[in-house]
């Protein structure tokens, strides 16, 4: 499968989205499902999905969160960032989703239609210490189930 960008940028992309999720929740006080909805409908999600180097590698997660929220509100937003000593569940989810989006070439919006952000976040306790391929396998399974359910509904 052709990927939107080289794996040389993948770690940067994962850190950027992870930091964006973390900043949205802990600096900007968004609930993750709300931020994810805003992000997945933003031009920044599309740029991320297509490998825009400025978005995936050229800025921090905090900067991405500021731009996504700013675009949504129609004004610039800046707050003193709150840094967590440990990697939060939100950070992990951003990190894992960036990898999965790159791996699957599935849009962030489509991913949210397959499984809710709340359910993805609930995967943290089981998957955060596993190799990322375990998360990929589970997401692939959920995608297949979703596609099969859709086909079943259409055939009824």
Locate each region found by the language model.
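Amphipathic alpha-helical interaction surfaces
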Residues: 45, 67-78, 99-106
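N-terminal interaction modules that seed assembly of large macromolecular complexes
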Residues: 7-67
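Alpha-helix capping and helix-coil boundary motifs
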Residues: 31, 60, 80, 88, ...
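A structured, charge-rich N-terminal accessory region that forms the first stable segment of a protein
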Residues: 3-4, 8-11, 87-107, 115-127, ...
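Generic structural signal of hydrophobic/aromatic residues within well-ordered alpha-helices
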Residues: 20-21, 44, 48, 64-68, ...
């Amino acid at each position: 499968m052709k990927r939107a960008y080289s794996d040389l940028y993948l770690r940067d992309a994962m850190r950027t989205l992870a930091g964006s999720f973390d900043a949205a929740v802990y600096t900007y006080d968004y609930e993750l499902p709300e931020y994810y909805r805003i992000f997945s409908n933003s031009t920044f999600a599309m740029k991320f999905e297509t490998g825009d180097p400025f978005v995936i590698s050229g800025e921090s997660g905090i900067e991405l969160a500021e731009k996504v929220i700013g675009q949504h509100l129609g004004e610039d937003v800046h707050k003193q960032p709150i840094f967590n000593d440990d990697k939060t569940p939100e950070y992990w989810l951003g990190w894992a989703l960036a990898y999965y989006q790159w791996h699957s070439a599935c849009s962030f919006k489509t991913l949210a239609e397959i499984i809710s952000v709340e359910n993805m976040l609930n995967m943290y306790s089981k998957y955060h210490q596993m190799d990322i391929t375990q998360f990929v396998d589970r997401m692939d399974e959920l995608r297949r189930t979703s596609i099969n359910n859709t086909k079943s509904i259409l055939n009824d």
